[in-house]
Amino acid sequence: MVVTEYELKPQNFPRFPLDWSEIFGRKAKIVVEIGFGNGEFLAELARRHPEKDFVGFEVSITSFVKAQKKFKRYNLKNVRLVKVDARFGLRELFPDNSVEKVYINFPCPWPKKRHESRRITSYDFLQTLSAVLEMDGTVEFATDEEWYAREVLDTFESSEYFVVDVFEENFKRDVETRYERKWKSQGKKTFLIVARKVKNGTVKRLMEGENTMAHSVFEGNVTWEKLKELEGKVFKDKNKIFVVKKVYRDGDYLLKVISTDEGGFQQVYYLNLSGRDGKWVLKLDEGSDPYRTPALKWSLRRIPEELTAQGSP
C-alpha cells in the first residue's frame, strides 16, 4: 500500500475510512498538517514527538520530494503523506473522533468570491473538522492576512462545535515554518488561532465502507462512431457530474474522463473498453489510480447505457 517509504495511496486500501493503527503498526495519537509545503514543520513535529503519528496532505509533487528527503534524513517512522485535496482526504480517510490536532499553516486565503468554498471557513470543512477531531482536539491556524484571520475567528466563535482558546497577533511557536520566519523578518503581522472541539459534529462521506473495484460488463453494437460522439458530452445526476474529454483507439479503446463529486472533488482518469463479438468490458485503465467515488462508479454505468441506447444521438 505504501508507494514510497512515506507516501500512501489510500485509493488502493480495502475500506474507508482507513485504519491508521494498521498503517503505522501501533495505536497512537494522530496529528494532521494540511499543506505541508517543503515538509520542514511536519518533520520537526514528528522528530520531537515520536510517541505520536503524523499525516500530511499536499498536492504538489515537488513538495513530496522535498519533504521525504527531510524525513529520510531524520529516519522518521511516524509520518505518512497523502497526495489529495485535504478537504476530501480529511473527511474520507479518518474516522470520527480520531484526530488529536490539525495544523493549517499560512494557506492560500482564496480572496475571490468564487473561491470562498476553498477556505477553511466553509461550512463543509467545518463539519469535517467537527466530526474527525477527537473531543477537545484542536485546529491550529496561522496566517499573515488579517482579514482572513478575522473571518476564521468569527467562524469558529459562531460555531456550536468549537471554542477559541487562542487568538494572537505576532505569535511565537517552538516550531516555525519557512513563511513564518520570512514574514517575521520582514516585520509583517502574523496571526494564530487555536480552536478546540467541544461538541461532536457529523459529516456525510462519499466512500464509507468497502472500496470495491469498479467495472461494467455489457452487450451491444459499439462502434468507433458512437464512441467519438461521446467526446465533450457532459453527464449530470444530482450531486455528481462527468465529461468524456477524449476517446482514443489503439487495439482497445481508451476514454479520458473528468468527474466531479459532491463537494467539488474532481478527478481525471482513463477507462479501458475492450470487447469481442458484441460483449464488452469497461474498466479503469491500469495506468489510472483514482478514488472509486460515486461519480466515477456512475460513469462506468452510464457510458455503457449511452453506447447501447437505441436511437441515441
Curated annotation (Swiss-Prot):
Classification via InterPro entries: SAM-dependent_MTases_sf, tRNA_(Gua-N-7)_MeTrfase_Trmb, tRNA_methyltr_TrmB_bact
S-S pairs: none
Record: residues binding substrate: 112, 144, 177-180
EC number in record: 2.1.1.33
Keywords on record: Methyltransferase, S-adenosyl-L-methionine, Transferase, tRNA processing
Catalytic function, reaction form: guanosine(46) in tRNA + S-adenosyl-L-methionine = N(7)-methylguanosine(46) in tRNA + S-adenosyl-L-homocysteine
CDD domains registered for this protein in UniProt: AdoMet_MTases
UniProt pathway: tRNA modification; N(7)-methylguanine-tRNA biosynthesis
Positions of S-adenosyl-L-methionine binding: 33, 58, 85
Molecular function terms from GO: tRNA (guanine(46)-N7)-methyltransferase activity
Biological process, per Gene Ontology: RNA (guanine-N7)-methylation; tRNA methylation
GO cellular component terms attached to this protein's record: tRNA methyltransferase complex
Gene3D superfamilies in the record: Vaccinia Virus protein VP39
Record-linked Pfam families: Methyltransf_4 (PF02390)
Protein family (similarity comment): Belongs to the class I-like SAM-binding methyltransferase superfamily. TrmB family.
Function: Catalyzes the formation of N(7)-methylguanine at position 46 (m7G46) in tRNA.
HAMAP family in UniProt: tRNA_methyltr_TrmB
Name by which UniProt lists this protein: tRNA (guanine-N(7)-)-methyltransferase
